Amino acid sequence: MAGWCWARRRKPQRLRATYTRRCGIEQLHGFYDVHADCLVGRIRKRKKARDIVACFTQLRACYPIQLRIYVVMDNLSANQRAAKDFFPGHNMEAVYLPTDASWLNAIECEFTALHAATLKNSDDRAHQIRRSRIYRYLRRRNRTHGSTRCSLARFMR
């Protein structure tokens, strides 16, 4: 069971050490609509430019083309190049955060809650288990916040 909660004191069941990732790691591309309070994400094997552009394409399809989308981004070089090439023709604009200032991004608070509910104290043997837990959390979070009907909710379908 992942996440954390209060429990009686007893001898805890220890988690195995995961210093080496034999199955590799996965990347969560997250999008947060601040107006509708809607959080969505897509998990990919890599964070390369083509994966980022695929997520941007899916994001653009959620909103009408007349609506300008401002995307707050960190300073990852793959993000900058992909955005520079993709955004001008799709009525989107990148807003880059200052270096070491990710706390300015509103999505970081949402990622903290996601981490506490799904990843903290977890010991998953397969990526599919972790993926399904993250997607289940995102669906439940949007349902409890009443943001299942926002345009960005189509991203998860």
Predicted regions and their residues:
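Acidic/histidine-rich, metal-coordinating catalytic segments
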Residues: 67-79
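RNase H-like polynucleotidyl transferase catalytic core
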Residues: 11-20, 89-106, 122-124
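Extended, low-complexity cationic-aromatic segments
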Residues: 1-54, 157
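Short, aromatic/basic amphipathic alpha-helical patches
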Residues: 81-89
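Short, basic/hydrophobic alpha-helical segments
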Residues: 50-70
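RNase H-like two-metal-ion nuclease catalytic core shared by retroviral integrases
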Residues: 73-75, 95-117, 128
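C-terminal anion-handling pockets and recognition modules
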Residues: 108-157
